Amino acid sequence: MHLPNSQIYKNFGESMNPFDIMKASQIACCLEVSSFKPGNVHRNRDYRDIKYHHFINAGIAFGNVVYEAAQKDRDVGLYIKKAVIESKKWSPTNANLGIIMLHIPIAMAAGKLENFDENKLKENLKKIAENTTVEDALNVYDAINIAMAYVNKPKKGPDVTSEDAKKELIEKGLTLLDVYKISAEWDNISKEWVDNFKISFEGYNLLKKYYDELNNINLAVTKTFLNLLAKYPDTLIARKRGFETALKVSKMAEDVLNNFKEEKVKEFDKYLSKEGNKLNPGTTADLIASSLMIFILDRIDKRETILW
């Protein structure tokens, strides 16, 4: 007998339970990497040093930490570090540090909700950021080094690659939010923490809009990706190739979005990938993953978990 989703869910507990939050994170990771996002690894493209299946594996692997974090309201840095350790077991290089930095606080914030509520989720995220500690910052510095993430020497603030960085954090009493306020100048993941996940929620609302229009989650992700990339120059590209190059890529994304056709998207993808991953809009991909997690949490709450 076929039951509608609403009937199936009646036997389940509250929609914002830790298992659902874990599943939202894992499914978001899988949808993010599987959808066609120009310049990124996707189901039809690997990079030399990291392949499509590494992202799938790594995105699923830290689910147990998301489950734990969803039941906590402190130690966000510790759970980011634990998630990176789990993820790194399944990937030869950094697959999802940025995603983890976004998914763990979202999980903790969602864990305090009885039902999905965008405004309450924002309030909870704000509290998590404001209550971070020096210990959280120390753990995130460890996480970055474990992940072997691409980082430049910062213009100011402690250098995560320096042996004295953690000592400087302690001496100056810098919390994780303090550190993110410094790095927000050149990193949009850090800026999300400072701006209360503004881009992630913008992406969530774009996903809703495009999915309602297209009834195709992969196309909805592609259009959301292009929209965010057009509006917010990718900070990974900026760190690798300079801000002017990042601006140029954003302008190209806007042109593709305004003339949204399969061949245009593929041409853009070919252009961005012609130098390996030098023009990889990886920060924007991470923001898609956080937008997707929020989108899926909303769908779980509405008992609308089947996506086309």
From Swiss-Prot:
InterPro entries to which the protein is assigned, alphabetical: CitG
Any one GO MF annotation of this record: triphosphoribosyl-dephospho-CoA synthase activity
This one is known as Uncharacterized protein MJ0227
Q: Record the organism.
A: Methanocaldococcus jannaschii (strain ATCC 43067 / DSM 2661 / JAL-1 / JCM 10045 / NBRC 100440)
